[in-house]
UniProtKB/Swiss-Prot annotation:
Belongs to the anhydro-N-acetylmuramic acid kinase family. Catalyzes the specific phosphorylation of 1,6-anhydro-N-acetylmuramic acid (anhMurNAc) with the simultaneous cleavage of the 1,6-anhydro ring, generating MurNAc-6-P. Is required for the utilization of anhMurNAc either imported from the medium or derived from its own cell wall murein, and thus plays a role in cell wall recycling. It comes from Yersinia enterocolitica serotype O:8 / biotype 1B (strain NCTC 13174 / 8081). The lineage of its organism: Bacteria, Pseudomonadati, Pseudomonadota, Gammaproteobacteria, Enterobacterales. The keyword Nucleotide-binding applies. Keywords: ATP-binding, Carbohydrate metabolism, Kinase, Nucleotide-binding, Transferase. This is Anhydro-N-acetylmuramic acid kinase. GO terms for biological process: 1,6-anhydro-N-acetyl-beta-muramic acid catabolic process; amino sugar metabolic process; peptidoglycan turnover. One of its GO terms (molecular function) is phosphotransferase activity, alcohol group as acceptor.
Length: 370
């Protein structure tokens, strides 16, 4: 496949909405043409959170959520098409990540589960859909994540400059784009996830806008050291994690050991945990000249400021400055991965995921007619 118009659909660990993006893609270029964020119904968000955090469930509940998410993703695509004034005939394919409800890369056997029925997406939109990207990498011994570093490399790598790309969603993940070295990438730990959970519990707000609440508090050093002593942070790459590990229950276990901390100080400490866990990994890799940040966390001035302070000599900037929307990066990546799949080309990087080989990712859900 030489070129086409693709739609990427992403619902990440932050659960702050369905990101949908339209892009013209060929071998040399990814040109974003439109984007849209579709709301996530509150009850559906609660259902996802319950499943992600290990609450008991049933096959019926899993099947129902899979169908509901497929319908929601299709509605999001149709809303983007209406906004852009396009029809199904204008689109080559959809790349849909799905909603991760469980990720167990070190299980015996390892597995990952993303919900959102791709059959329904293809049927409702009348557009061929590519989905289920992660499990093929796992079948070859990889962690199934992260997959976005391959896209970061295609778009943002430089021949001489040491660059790293940091996506701060619910989980923070880092792509190391170092000249003459294999691409590496992994989840550094929590991004916005714990901060969002804490402010929701204490102030009924979905996120800490402009880090206003965190800025009103102070870092609690004993709590920071306790949280950072979690074995995940010292684990070597390849590694990946998610809400099934870093969640409100994990935070409560830490807080129970050091009771009486002011809520705003907890928030400040969680922001510091995100910044510190990223900065440590950047330094361990020998540093970089530019750290390009995307995702919702790029709008957190405290996290951005702290990373700049912890990384002297590194320019901490946003991917928007380099022509790639930070809000749409992951959705763009899955549009690009759909292009790679339909072109018969690999989408994973074994140096990132630990897979035994490069492989074409995902499954294709065609439409019989439009």
């Amino acid at each position: 496949m030489k070129s086409g118009r693709f739609i990427g659909v992403m619902s990440g660990t932050s659960l702050d909405g369905i990101d949908v993006v339209l892009a013209a893609i060929d071998e040399r270029m990814v040109a974003q043409q439109a984007s849209y964020c579709h709301p996530m119904p509150l009850q559906l968000k609660k259902d996802i959170l319950g499943m992600c955090q290990g609450q008991s469930t049933t096959l019926s509940a899993v099947g129902k959520l899979d169908a509901q998410l497929g319908i929601l993703f299709a509605e999001a695509v149709l809303a983007l098409l209406a906004k852009a004034g396009l029809t199904a005939q204008d689109i080559t394919a959809i790349g849909c990540h799905g909603q991760t409800v469980w990720h167990e890369p070190l299980g015996e056997p390892a597995f990952t589960m993303q919900l959102g029925d791709n059959n329904r997406i293809a049927a409702m939109t009348k557009i061929a859909t590519v989905g289920d990207f992660r499990r093929r990498d796992m079948a070859y011994g990889g962690q199934g994540a992260p997959l976005v570093p391959a896209f970061h490399h295609a778009l943002l790598a430089h021949s001489t400059e040491r660059r790293m790309v940091l996506n701060i969603g619910g989980i923070a993940n880092l792509s190391m784009l170092l000249p003459d070295l294999p691409v590496r990438g992994f989840d550094t730990g929590p991004g916005n996830m714990l901060m969002d959970a804490w402010i929701w519990r204490n102030r009924s707000l979905p996120y800490d806008k402009d880090a206003a609440w965190a800025l009103s508090g102070q870092v609690n050093q004993p709590l920071l050291e306790l949280m950072y002593s979690d074995p995940y942070f010292a684990k070597p790459a390849p590694k990946s994690t998610g809400r099934e590990y870093f969640n409100a229950g994990w935070l409560d276990k830490q807080l129970n050991k050091i009771p009486g901390i002011k809520p705003e100080d907890v928030q400040a400490t969680l922001a510091e945990l995100t910044a510190l866990s990223v900065a440590e990994q950047v330094q361990l890799a020998g540093g970089c000249e530019r750290l390009l940040v995307c995702g919702g966390g790029a709008r957190n001035p405290l996290v951005m400021s702290r990373m700049s302070t912890l990384l002297p000599g590194t320019e901490v900037c946003v991917t928007d400055d380099f022509g790639v929307s930070g809000d749409d990066m992951e959705a763009l990546a899955f549009a690009w991965l759909a292009f790679r799949t339909l072109s018969g080309k690999s989408g994973n990087l074994p140096s990132v995921t630990g897979a035994s080989c490069e492989t074409i990712l995902g499954a294709v859900y065609p439409v019989s007619s439009r």
